[in-house]
Amino acid sequence: MRLDTMKETPSSPVNTEMQDNFGCAVGNRFHQLLDDESDPLDFLYQSGVELTRRKKKEDAAAKKSANQKSGKKESQKDRKAAVVGGNTDVKMTPQTESGKVSQKDRKTFVVGGNTDVKVTQPGQKHAPKNMEKAPQNENVGSQVKVDRAERRPAFREVRPNIMDRSNEYSIEKPMEILDQDKQMRNYGGRGGMRGRGRGGFPRNTENDNLRGKREFDRHSGSDRAIRPEDKRGGSGPRNWGSIKEAFSEIEAIPVEEQIETTETTEATEEEHAKVPEEKNEGFSQEMSLDEWRSLQDQNRSKTEFNLRKPEAAVPTKAVVIHKSKFKNNLSENEEDYHYCFRKPVNDITAQLDINFGSLTRPSRGRGGGGRGRVRREEAFPHEVINVLADAPNPDDPEDFPALA
């Protein structure tokens, strides 16, 4: 839009120049929304319709691609040919566009009835021979189960191929062991009281052992190598004797003796428990702390040390150090203690008298010539200062109070 600040006067040329020179252009940012009367909900509805159209197009394209693929490879449902009912002759020639036949295409699933199935593969010229016809019977599966059950040998059945087992080692179980076996067998097999599977409910509660298998005799080697008669005399292989003799040697301990022993042990324990209580009651006394400590010292076990007594004889390697000799050595070495640094053998500094105060200092004067009053240096006497003190005497209690 273009707005003019001046009023229009058609006859004046000045106004036209003013319009061209002093006009300003103003743009309205919201002029596009002035003519918009549509509802925003309509826009949302249209966008939803467009989305549905796109989805339909995508689904149609996916179906077309699937049909194209199915022309090359058949689906799994098409590969299965299920034939149900009476006598039928089925001939299958699985061939695809590519000319290859998959292994799944060669399978035929036939359910019930007599069927003659002929499968011709592309590599074979003639079809294979007809398969043998199965007998007509509706309960085919049940008949097979019955045959398998009949083939199973009975539990603990003596088989003709195996020699008769000798009962020489069999021992009758006592009643207590049989009761325990029955209680343990009630828990079932590995799975417990499940009702099915390996566990399940117990089959027989009698004449069975804990392991659930046949009871093996106690011997080593195979059944063929066992001799029926017992060996005696202590010679030859497998001379173990009979197990009955081993059990007869073990004598059962009577129950009365066990009861008597338990009663005696209980009585002795009660007596031992009463005796310390009586002693403690009579020993209660009042005493001071010092008396109690003295009693503790008396009751305490004293440790005995194996001390060596001094001998009168002097050992041969003993050396006596005289005190006078030690003092003389100290007096001789007193001069050496004044020097704390090591000195070489050819050192002459101890013989020279060096005075550092005799050195001349630079004069103070005007100009660079060093003119001025000459200052007279005074000679200072050289004083010898003893830095190190005398070494302490170990025999003097004042120097070593802890060693006195």
Swiss-Prot record:
One Gene Ontology MF term: ribosome binding
Region feature Disordered, mapped onto this chain: 1-21, 51-288, 359-379
Cellular component GO terms, alphabetical: Cajal body; cytoplasm; cytoplasmic stress granule; nuclear speck; nucleolus; nucleus
UniProt-annotated location(s): Nucleus; Cytoplasm; Cytoplasm, Stress granule; Nucleus, Nucleolus
Domain of life: Eukaryota
Ranges of biased composition (kind: Basic and acidic residues): 71-81, 145-159, 165-184, 205-233, 270-281
Assigned keywords, A-Z: Cytoplasm, Nucleus, Translation regulation
Biological processes per GO annotation: positive regulation of RNA splicing; positive regulation of translational initiation; ribosome hibernation
Compositional bias per record (Polar residues), positions renumbered to this chain: 8-19
Major location category of this protein: nucleus
Pfam families: HABP4_PAI-RBP1 (PF04774), IHABP4_N (PF16174)
InterPro entries registered for this protein in UniProt: HABP4/SERBP1-like (IPR039764), HABP4_PAIRBP1-bd (IPR006861), IHABP4_N (IPR032381)
Gene3D superfamilies (UniProt xref): 6.10.140.1040
Biased composition range(s): Gly residues: 188-200
Role played: Ribosome-binding protein that promotes ribosome hibernation, a process during which ribosomes are stabilized in an inactive state and preserved from proteasomal degradation. Acts via its association with eef2/eEF2 factor at the A-site of the ribosome, promoting ribosome stabilization in an inactive state compatible with storage. Plays a key role in ribosome hibernation in the mature egg by promoting ribosome stabilization. Ribosomes, which are produced in large quantities during oogenesis, are stored and translationally repressed in the egg and early embryo.
Family (UniProt): Belongs to the SERBP1-HABP4 family.
PANTHER family given in the database record: HYALURONIC ACID-BINDING PROTEIN 4, INTRACELLULAR HYALURONAN-BINDING PROTEIN 4
Subunit: Associates with ribosomes; promoting ribosome stabilization. Interacts with eef2/eEF2; promoting ribosome stabilization.
Name assigned to this protein: Intracellular hyaluronan-binding protein 4.L
Phylogenetic placement of the source organism: Eukaryota, Metazoa, Chordata, Craniata, Vertebrata
